[in-house]
Amino acid sequence: MKVFEMRAFTWVITGLLDSGKTTLINRLLKEELSDTNVLVLQFEEGEEPLIQADNVRKLVFSKKELEKEPFSVAGKVILYLEKQPADLMLIEWNGIEHFHTLEEMFLSSPAQMVVTVARLIYVADGGHMESRIMDAGLPTFSQIAGSDCAYIRTKSRHSRSERKEFLHSCNPGIKVYTSHDWKHFRREFFAVKFY
C-alpha cells in the first residue's frame, strides 16, 4: 500500500434504527457542509435517503459484509479515498453493532494511517428513548459511552433534562442537544474545524 498523503477526518454518527441519523447527516450536508467534499459511509440504510449533491459521495456496506469481513470493508474505504480523496468522512454506524468493530476497522489497523475520528455523535429519537436503549443492550451503551455529544429528536422542549440525565448515567461527559437546540449544537460542533 502506498503512503497515503491525506488524512480523512471523520465524524461518526451512530444510534438505533429510525433514530434520525440520516436526517441529521442530511441537515449537516445541506446547512453546514455544502462547500465541503464529503464521503458518507452507510452501514445501514433507514427510510430516509441520503441527499444527492455534487459534493457528496457515498459507499454502502451491508451488516453481513461488516460482520464477515470488517477489514476488507476498511480496505475498500482506503482504496476509494486514495482514488477520490474527501475533506471529511461521515460514518453512519449501525446502531446495534459493537463500537469496538469500528475501532478495530479504522483505529487499530492500517486504516489508522488514513482515518482520524474527530467527533462521535449519538443520535436518538426522544420518544421512548430510554426503553429502546435498554432493550438494545451493550453495543448501544458502548456507543453512548464513547460519544462526544448526543443529538435527540424531540417534540417537546421540556424533555431535554430527563434525556440528559439518562445519557449522563452512561457517559457523564456527554453534551446533550435536542432538535430544538440546533443553533447551540451547530455553534459547539463547528467551533473548531476538524477538516
Where do the model's predicted regions map?
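Polar low-complexity intrinsically disordered regions
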Residues: 1-2, 147
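Nucleotide-state-sensitive switch-loop elements of NTP-binding domains
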Residues: 3-14, 19, 23-119, 125-130
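Residue-level signal for alpha-helical context at structural boundaries
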Residues: 42-43, 138, 165, 185
